[in-house]
Amino acid sequence: MSLVSQNSRRRRRRVAKATAHNSSWGEMQAPNAPGLPADVPGSDVPQGPSDSQILQGLCASEGPSTSVLPTSAEGPSTFVPPTISEASSASGQPTISEGPGTSVLPTPSEGLSTSGPPTISKGLCTSVTLAASEGRNTSRPPTSSEEPSTSVPPTASEVPSTSLPPTPGEGTSTSVPPTAYEGPSTSVVPTPDEGPSTSVLPTPGEGPGTSVPLAATEGLSTSVQATPDEGPSTSVPPTATEGLSTPVPPTRDEGPSTSVPATPGEGPSTSVLPAASDGQSISLVPTRGKGSSTSVPPTATEGLSTSVQPTAGEGSSTSVPPTPGGGLSTSVPPTATEELSTSVPPTPGEGPSTSVLPIPGEGLSTSVPPTASDGSDTSVPPTPGEGASTLVQPTAPDGPGSSVLPNPGEGPSTLFSSSASVDRNPSKCSLVLPSPRVTKASVDSDSEGPKGAEGPIEFEVLRDCESPNSISIMGLNTSRVAITLKPQDPMEQNVAELLQFLLVKDQSKYPIRESEMREYIVKEYRNQFPEILRRAAAHLECIFRFELRELDPEAHTYILLNKLGPVPFEGLEESPNGPKMGLLMMILGQIFLNGNQAKEAEIWEMLWRMGVQRERRLSIFGNPKRLLSVEFVWQRYLDYRPVTDCKPVEYEFFWGPRSHLETTKMKILKFMAKIYNKDPMDWPEKYNEALEEDAARAFAEGWQALPHFRRPFFEEAAAEVPSPDSEVSSYSSKYAPHSWPESRLESKARKLVQLFLLMDSTKLPIPKKGILYYIGRECSKVFPDLLNRAARTLNHVYGTELVVLDPRNHSYTLYNRREMEETEEIVDSPNRPGNNFLMQVLSFIFIMGNHARESAVWAFLRGLGVQAGRKHVITCRYLSQRYIDSLRVPDSDPVQYEFVWGPRARLETSKMKALRYVARIHRKEPQDWPQQYREAMEDEANRADVGHRQIFVHNFR
């Protein structure tokens, strides 16, 4: 006999048994059976087909309910709920072709299934599952003479129906709803391989119903729970590994329902939680196996639904949380590697919904965030999963939903969105990134990235319609808190552009015009210039500690004031514009001492006495005429005005608005006192004026404990700066330092300053004899005093140091410490950089052992392309500038000389700089010359121990 004939006979025999058994049920459950109480419907019992409790579980569509779950190659399942009239109908004769609900589940490990919510809230429709022991799904569609398996739900007034599944691998099952409120249940246990075991629900007050499972390995145990307010119902599942357990919980809220699932079974387990408002339902789903687990939580507002998903299977796990209430729905997903976890959070409620997705799973993960206004939803994704992920985003207007996608898997990721008809719907778009590293913007500390994940990585970008500038990016490998990126507002972008322009423009020290600032603002936002300027000023003050001050209200010019604090005063040579600022302070002091105004001729006369001539260009600050009449005036340090009623036209200098903001009269007066070696109170009138100005400033600033600090160019000298006279007070002279008149001393000192400035461009040392020849031999009596006055002026005004180059010959030179420390390569003539071989010669001498024969240096210069006659000129110039010194080689015949570093070379450069210079030429590292490198390191340590050189000269005779 063929296999088809055997299956047909078995189906006919099972249908006959089910028909006979259903007939006995009809006799036992007559509506007017004696000995039973009258049918009094409770408050929670549906009253008719149109009752809200029945309509509560229905979807929008009205067609028959058909849920066919796909195999691994078919795609997602389709679920069509029934209409109200069809869901509440009952059939007396259980044929295979009558029920409106048909659900064919796939076998384990063949695919994934996603099922929507139940169609009827009070009735139970139990689906039919193919046997798990048969491996892959071998189900076939019905032929023309056959009908699909049917599940007939109860009517509105009936209790939940009972599903009679077939034995494993034999066919489909038929669920026939019982009539209402009949006698106690009777459980008939069939023999092995014959049929299912059915437990019929007892009436109220009759006690609990007990279901004894099958003893065979292929039997089925079905438990129908007790009715309202009665004792608990206990369902003992089959011990076989292939049976199906379907617990149906009570419909009232007082009695808790406990369902103990099959432990080793492979079939699906379906748990329908109570629909009442106050009851608690705990559903323990199979811990092992390959079937699917479906948990339908209560629909009331206060019920607690806890669903523990399978821990080791390959099937799907579906958790449907409560829909309207404020209860808490917690879904713990399976930990298997290939299962599907679907979490549907509460829709309108206020309670939080937490969905923990599978951790190592390879299957599809579906998360439906809440749509309620007050509830929050937190979804934690799987970390190493290899399967596809499904995310359903919230659509409610007020409810915050934080949903995070799972890790990238091997399969594609599918994005679903819930279809709620509300005003604020976040728009979603899929962004494919080339590399998984891009998604590591926000990763939880406990999560790990995918190991060996391939394929594109996806982000979901949510843009709020009401706030278009707010974009939420929720990507893979993130948790709990999603990344929220806010694109730059156009106003903030204009503020950033203006801020950058102000910082760059301030470096030139020129006033910033309003018209220039408007050019960096987009035309559409120029009418909001005051607000943009206010925001930029706030950023400058909070971040960069600059104060934006309006310089001239009529011209609409602005400047930046530094508020970082005072910088210790160590001479203006430490500032980038030290010589220029020193000259400016001299001019401001002259204007202040002359009655707050000074004619141009008087200023130039004062500068000429200081060694600065109008038409002579100096290497320190360039063209003096342009510096005064153009640069200082443009920077608004000075005001340059013509004198009225004067022919020919003359001009006067005044303090500019920037000078009033960045310095004070008291600071300028103290500066002039240092220059002239006096006390500020030696000018009593000016001293009182400076005190009045300080008092007015303090009153205007509200007696602030921390006054506004300005740029360090005008910071007064610190008290700890030693007086120059104290360092040279031990000079030996038979004349007192102030035996000459003060005016004559000042005149000689200014002449000495002029000499040093003129000789500085030649890099030649200035001997004492040459100085006395220039200023007069009679000055030898007061030479130390004159030299100290000149050194003080050169330091404070021009930012240079007067140092003793050779104590034996009493030669002097100017030294700019800041410039030399920052300069890596020195030159012997700034005006002829192409003809300088100074660093080459010094490096050659150092590499040769700190001394080199004259013939070797000349050969080295010939190798650099120097002509035969030029080598003598170069070495003679270096000798005269004291960059190198010549020493006679002892016992040499004929007499020979060797070159060593001179005092100027040791002053302006170091051995480490020379070694780095050689390394750059030969494309090596300084460590490639280990002996010279150690010597250079020792030289650097010695220089650090000595510290700063004394800026004032001494050792005078």
Swiss-Prot record:
Keyword annotations: Cell membrane, Cytoplasm, Membrane, Nucleus, Repeat, Tumor antigen, Ubl conjugation pathway
Superkingdom of origin organism: Eukaryota
Region named Interaction with DTNA: 743-957
Any Gene Ontology biological process: negative regulation of transcription by RNA polymerase II
InterPro entries per UniProt: MAGE, MAGE_WH1, MAGE_WH2, MHD_dom
Biased amino acid composition, Low complexity: 138-162
Major localization listed first in the record, in broad terms: cytoplasm
UniProt GO cellular component terms: dendrite; nucleus; perinuclear region of cytoplasm; plasma membrane; postsynaptic membrane
Domain MAGE: 491-690, 745-936
Stretches for region Disordered: 1-455
Outcome when changing residue 640 to F: In a breast cancer sample; somatic mutation
Bias (Polar residues) ranges: 85-96, 104-130, 219-244, 268-320, 329-344, 364-380, 414-428
Pfam families membership: MAGE (PF01454)
Record localization: Cytoplasm, Perinuclear region; Nucleus; Cell membrane
Subunit structure of this chain's protein: Interacts with DTNA. Interacts with TRIM28.
Function: May enhance ubiquitin ligase activity of RING-type zinc finger-containing E3 ubiquitin-protein ligases. Proposed to act through recruitment and/or stabilization of the Ubl-conjugating enzyme (E2) at the E3:substrate complex.
Protein name: Melanoma-associated antigen E1
The species this protein was found in: Homo sapiens
